[in-house]
Structure formats: structure tokens, C-alpha cells
Amino acid sequence: GCSHRIGTPSTRLALPEITIGLFPDAGATWFLSQMPRHWAYFMAWTGCQLNAQDGLVVGLIDHLLDYTEQAAILECLTNEVWSADGEANKLRLSQILQNAASDAKDFPPSQLIAHEARIMAVMDQVLASEKPVSAFFTAVDDFADDKFLARAANGIKRGSPTTAHIIHE
């Protein structure tokens, strides 16, 4: 990982392993293990694309920065007197990014938050079942009425069953 994870209005995040038949690598596995369980399984089983606001929700992004702040941030970073103390530099960088943080009004809204109740209900039911992968495969049939959820459902429907089972293990 990195020390300061930044999202912009055009940020796109995904875990496409399900769609290409691979298993999540050590980095993805670590990040998934740090997330709330329902988000981790939903993301890994669907390969859904997330935006910066979603990244904040699942803990993959720390700061939202608008493009309009880029020049000012670069100037601030260039003019900063950095020390030999790595921890002090991290703290100072955090302060700079926090000061420049966007109020996110120009960012696309979180799709995860918009669909949280529905995703949580499905994931709670699926993860409590004896065969979670099969249960999720069936449960996503109910996602057809929503563009974001239908696209997410296609991830597992068209993805690798082997990868889905590896993700569950």
C-alpha cells in the first residue's frame, strides 16, 4: 500500500479478479481483510467499479482532492521544507492533504452508500448460508432492476466460479 491514498472525481477502483479468472493477490487479500465483511465479499465477487466516494466508504482512499487543487498542492509540496524524519514528513503531508481536501460536492456520489441497505441484506443472507457462493449467484438475479447492481451482478454471473470459491475461502 501507500501512505496517503488520494481519490479524485474520476477515480475508479475495482477488483477484477473474478472476471479474469485469477485469485486476489496478497495486496488485495490484505485490503479485503481490512474492510467490513459485506463490502469485501461484494467487491471481490462482483468486480464492481467504485468511485472515490466508494473508496472512502471501504477504506481504500484517505483524501478526496479535486483537480482544481492540484497546482496549489504541488506548489505547497515543492515549497515545503522536508526533514530527515520520515514520520514528521508523513504527518506534514497528511496536514497538507487535509487542508486541501475537497468537500466532494463535485464528486460522483457513493454507489455503495446508495445501495447499502440492499447489499447488506443480500450479503447477510448469503454469508449465513451453507453455500455462500451459490447463494450469492442466485441472489444477484434480484439486482436486474438497478443499473449499478445489475452491472455488479454480471461480475459473478460472467466470472470464474473457481475464483468465486477461492475468494470465499
Predicted segments, located by residue:
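CoA-thioester-processing core
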Residues: 1-43, 57-58, 73-77
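Short, functional N-terminal and low-complexity linear motifs
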Residues: 21-23, 40-45, 134-136, 154-158
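Contiguous mid-protein beta-loop-alpha structural module that forms a pocket-lining wall or clamp
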Residues: 34-88
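Homeobox/homeodomain signature
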Residues: 3, 13, 22, 40, ...
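Amphipathic alpha-helical blocks and their helix-capping loop/short-beta junctions
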Residues: 66-159
